[in-house]
């Protein structure tokens, strides 16, 4: 029995201007959540000094979290959805389109 799908990803070579500021990261994450048809319950973002962002979106299906290191061009993503497993795949694809990493690695876990 699979109750959900969980993608854990590291994106490398992401442009600094996409991941240094909370406003930009928030905009991208919120757009992905919306376009992937996930049900947002709430969100919290933290801007680090001098740069870098952590954010988490609580969704009815589970959660989306992001951590950025602009100085390394690095984004760590965690996307977990219960129910329709296609939504996690759609969200991940959208993140790749938005962040345009030079490379990435990811792990897909079927939960349950």
UniProtKB/Swiss-Prot annotation:
Keywords: Autocatalytic cleavage, Decarboxylase, Lyase, Polyamine biosynthesis, Pyruvate, S-adenosyl-L-methionine, Schiff base, Spermidine biosynthesis, Zymogen. One of its GO terms (molecular function) is adenosylmethionine decarboxylase activity. One of its GO terms (biological process) is spermidine biosynthetic process. The active site is at residues 62, 67, 82. It catalyses: S-adenosyl-L-methionine + H(+) = S-adenosyl 3-(methylsulfanyl)propylamine + CO2. GO terms for cellular component: cytosol. Binds 1 pyruvoyl group covalently per subunit. InterPro entries: AdoMetDC_fam_prok, S-AdoMet_deCO2ase_core, S-AdoMet_deCOase_pro-enz. The keyword Calcium does not apply. Is synthesized initially as an inactive proenzyme. Formation of the active enzyme involves a self-maturation process in which the active site pyruvoyl group is generated from an internal serine residue via an autocatalytic post-translational modification. Two non-identical subunits are generated from the proenzyme in this reaction, and the pyruvate is formed at the N-terminus of the alpha chain, which is derived from the carboxyl end of the proenzyme. It comes from the Archaea. The record marks 61-62 as: Cleavage (non-hydrolytic). Its cofactor is pyruvate. Its EC number is 4.1.1.50. The keyword Lyase applies. Pathway: Amine and polyamine biosynthesis; S-adenosylmethioninamine biosynthesis; S-adenosylmethioninamine from S-adenosyl-L-methionine: step 1/1. It is an enzyme of class 4 (lyase). The modification Pyruvic acid (Ser) is found at residue 62. Catalyzes the decarboxylation of S-adenosylmethionine to S-adenosylmethioninamine (dcAdoMet), the propylamine donor required for the synthesis of the polyamines spermine and spermidine from the diamine putrescine. Belongs to the prokaryotic AdoMetDC family. Type 1 subfamily. Heterotetramer of two alpha and two beta chains arranged as a dimer of alpha/beta heterodimers. HAMAP family: AdoMetDC_1. This is S-adenosylmethionine decarboxylase proenzyme.
